[in-house]
Amino acid sequence: MAGRSQPVLAGVVTALVGFASSFTVVLAGLRAVGASDAQAASGLLAVCVASGISAVWLGLRHRIPMSVAWSTPGAALLVATGTVPGGWPVAVGAFLVSGALIVAAGLFPALGRAVAAIPRPIAGAMLAGVLLPLCTAPVRALVEVPRLAVPVVLAWLLLHRFARRWAVPGALVVAVAAIALTTPVSGLGGARLLPAVELTAPAWNVSAMVGLALPLFLVTMAAQNVPGMAVLVGYGYRPPFGAALRATGLTTVLAAPAGGHAVNLAAITAALAAGPDAHPDPDRRWIASVTAGTGLALLGLGAGAATALVALAPPVLIEAVAGLALLGALATALTSALAEPADREAAVVTFVVTASGVTLLGVGGAFWGLVAGGVMLLLFRRRSGGPTAPESTSAPVTTPSPGPAVEPVTTESPGPAVEPATSGSAGPTGTGRVGVTPRAAGRGPGRRGVPGRR
């Protein structure tokens, strides 16, 4: 009986940790690009349901524990971008285009190869620049609202030391308690506790497509889908990368009119469902990801109450909880950005330009960071006669699968050593290129979804 319940319990934990660790980032991001409280609640509901549908479909179809989540780094990108010209409808249009690009990457391997061609230091530096503003929020909160922020940060520190996966959820519980003790009950008087779908007709303009849709696609691919695949490969699975991109991209497109910004493979929380803690038998772990998807969809029903809570709290306190959730991703992104000595200056330029938050020609800093770092890298490599960075010494892992598959993946923590610390977000890992490229490949040995012999 315990063996049957083990993957179900692992799935419940995966859903709870994933939701509680980063829903504040999602709400902050949606509100930053112009969503009202009702539209932000609708967006959170949309990404929960879309993630759940994708996880259930992929788990049942392929019998692989492919956990799906919203793009936490993508939500941080929304915070860094702020309101785009044209407001919320244009942001919704950017979400839709980003989802369509993910579908295209699953259908056309060349697009996936183009994303994988972005040097890892540049991708990591861009992600670090996107995350930095939110990661400084805990410091600002300690200065601006110390009575509320000090207990939250202390709870995070203690739990991070003794129970890392519960550090951010625990900090959130303390924040909720602090808000409840300092906010009159009448503050919830007009709040809508159950979310309602708020559909928005998408609109488009060039600056939002370049400044939001394209960076959102790149961040989601490099910081979520690639590490998520690497986790599965590290646990011995041969996941169908193309199928995962098509499923998550399609659900992103469907969720966009309701305010959903991006759905993708989970990265850190993927280890909760794919590792031996989910079940000793790898063939049974897919039950954990299906349970997690179902649980996340149900947790979406609390989007209205979560939004009402965020609206009552001092904005800097909510940003502080979000920043604590992203510290692990920031550390990983910085490690990736500075891993190659020959590329460090270009990575630093990318980081500085992205973190500056500058807007030029209506396009945000993430795009210009990529451009600045890419140009500098190109000039330095051309002057020196080509790349001088040392090759990675890690042994690549090949993962054949039907249709679009994955190229050799290099990751710093490929197996059970993955520590589920925060949410489904993680920066690029390892060295070299971004690391996962869709391509055509034959079916590997064994049944579909059964881990290959290591």
Task: Describe each region flagged by the PLM.
Residues 7-25, 45-123, 239-327:
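Helix-loop-helix junctions within the multi-pass membrane cores of secondary transporters/permeases
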Residues 5-8, 151, 210, 246-250, ...:
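Alpha-helical membrane-protein architecture signal
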Residues 29, 78, 114, 135-139, ...:
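Hydrophobic alpha-helical interface/terminus motif in multipass membrane transporters
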Residues 387-396, 401-404, 408, 413-416, ...:
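Intrinsically disordered, low-complexity proline-rich tandem-repeat tracts
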Residues 374-390, 442, 449-454:
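Terminal cytosolic tails of multi-pass membrane transporters
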Residues 85-186, 291-386:
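Membrane-embedded alpha-helical modules
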